[in-house]
From Swiss-Prot:
This is UDP-N-acetylglucosamine--peptide N-acetylglucosaminyltransferase stabilizing protein GtfB. Keywords: Cell membrane, Membrane. GO terms for cellular component: plasma membrane; protein N-acetylglucosaminyltransferase complex. InterPro entries: GtfB (IPR014268). Pathway: Protein modification; protein glycosylation. It comes from the Bacteria. HAMAP family: GtfB. Interacts with glycosyltransferase GtfA; probably forms a heterotetramer with 2 subunits each of GtfA and GtfB. Part of the accessory SecA2/SecY2 protein translocation apparatus. It is found in: Cell membrane. Its main location: membrane. GO terms for biological process: protein O-linked glycosylation via serine; regulation of protein stability. Belongs to the GtfB family.
Length: 445
């Protein structure tokens, strides 16, 4: 079985890691030219480039013109010519420390005209040029020797591939190129599993071997109607896709409501087998990550739980308002916290409070979920409801209820296990045995 993703999103990662735990997957393919894919995943746009050695580029190592200056912090960086911004540096996703993934170069009017794409080996492996209207025109991919290997025309959609000692190959679109790539790998493509109805579905639909048996994993909401391509899967006997897995229970039930009963056996509800990084140790230690000094009811919560240590971390300097929290003996502050320090704090804490206003910092709720922290918050501040059980979200006026929930969870192992069970169930967690058995049934194994 081959996994096929448009991009390595959080949803793709959850599916990939769940399948990896079962041992059922042969290979994962990501169409997006992502230079920071983890080991075990391939992109057709980077596969032929030959990069295998090197370290990621640190933000201040980006080549710039004389007298231009690189300015950056833990969140972003830019390149300036005196006072004019000439480029924006994008970091690799996740908890990585200022590692360069993309540089957007601007003209004197501030429009992006060129984007340099970097990989985890510190190389600029591709360059995209843009029109005056900021529309992508062309992406050129170069190999480890600096030779042009791939050229993608974003206007016409065609792709040119030039391999050493071979004639140039022309592909009219991504579907043709990806189909060639899968054939070139000389692997069994009789079963594809994919998670969007865009390019991956079209690869399945146009695959020359019509005898295959593919699976769609639908990870998006459903509203008033079934998408057209999903309807095609349900109604046609001539498509390779035979089953539709829906991880979210509410979305699965909505799919049944929107379709005729005769199609219901094509839908399967199956969540994810998440890869938790550690156990919860029932420690009286709570973590808050924030980009703001507006933390809802933090004084009241800290005062009501004097035996709980509250660790508040920010990647910037803290305001005097936050620094005043040091008057509470059970509060510890971490300003200008590095990604490494934040990872340490996740290891120290067993509760996460999603109570900061403004933006979420470094996918904090998801990170807390992966570290098996019990997550609680307020409806007025919640950043990611997917990983927080509904019983653990409160109105900002319900401080007493939140405090009592924390006390109950910390009272004994069974109470914490029950609270974490609600959290996992809400996030569609499935134990490995059930996940493996269900997936094998879907795949026909």
């Amino acid at each position: 079985m081959i996994e096929l993703y448009d991009s390595y999103s959080q949803e793709s990662r959850d599916l990939h890691e769940s399948l990896g735990a079962t041992g059922l997957s042969q290979l994962g393919v990501v169409i997006d030219a992502d230079g920071f894919l983890p080991d075990g995943l391939l992109s057709p746009f980077t596969y032929y480039l030959g990069y295998e050695d090197g370290k990621p580029l640190y933000f201040n190592q980006v080549p710039v013109s004389d007298f231009w200056e690189i300015l950056g912090d833990n969140q972003s960086a830019c390149i300036e010519d005196v006072t004019q911004e000439r480029a924006v540096i994008h970091y690799a996703d996740g908890m990585q420390a200022r590692l360069v993934k993309q540089v957007d170069w601007k003209d004197l009017e501030g429009r992006v005209r060129q984007v340099d794409h970097y990989n985890r080996f510190g190389a600029c492996f591709a360059t995209t040029t843009y029109s005056a209207d900021s529309e992508p025109i062309m992406t050129v991919y170069q190999d480890v020797n600096g030779q042009q290997v791939l050229l993608e025309n974003h206007v016409t959609g065609d792709i040119l591939l030039t391999l050493p000692g071979q004639s140039m190959r022309y592909f009219a679109n991504k579907v043709e190129f990806i189909t060639f790539f899968l054939q070139d790998l000389e692997i069994d493509t009789s079963q594809l599993i994919f998670n969007t109805l865009a390019t991956p579905f079209l690869v399945s639909f146009h695959h020359p071997d019509k005898s295959g048996s593919d699976v769609l994993v639908w990870q998006e909401p459903l509203y008033d109607a079934i998408p057209g391509n999903m309807q095609l899967i349900l109604e046609s006997d001539n498509v390779r896709t035979k089953k539709i897995i829906i991880p979210n229970k509410a979305t699965y039930e909505r799919a049944l409501e929107l379709t005729d009963e005769k199609y219901h056996d094509q839908f399967v509800h199956l969540g994810y087998h998440y890869q938790f990084k550690r156990d919860n140790f029932l420690r009286r230690d709570a973590l808050i990550l924030t980009n703001s000094d507006q933390i809802e009811q933090v004084e009241a919560i800290a005062g009501a739980l004097p035996d709980v240590t509250f660790r508040i971390a920010a990647v910037t300097e803290m305001s005097s308002k936050l620094l005043d929290m040091l008057c509470y003996p059970n509060v510890a502050l971490y300003q200008n916290a590095s990604p490494q320090k934040i990872q340490e704090l996740y290891q120290l804490s067993d509760i996460y409070l999603d109570i900061n206003h403004s933006n979420e910092l470094l996918q904090a709720v998801r990170q807390a979920f992966e570290h098996n922290l019990l997550i609680l918050g307020f409806n007025q501040t919640v950043h990611n409801r997917l990983y927080i059980a509904p019983d653990h979200l409160f109105e900002s006026s319900e401080v007493a209820a939140l405090v009592e929930t924390i006390k109950l969870a910390l009272s004994d192992v069974d109470q914490m296990r029950q609270a974490l069970g609600k959290q996992g169930q809400h996030a569609n967690y499935v134990d490995l045995v059930r996940y493996q058995e269900t997936m094998q049934t879907v795949l026909g194994g």
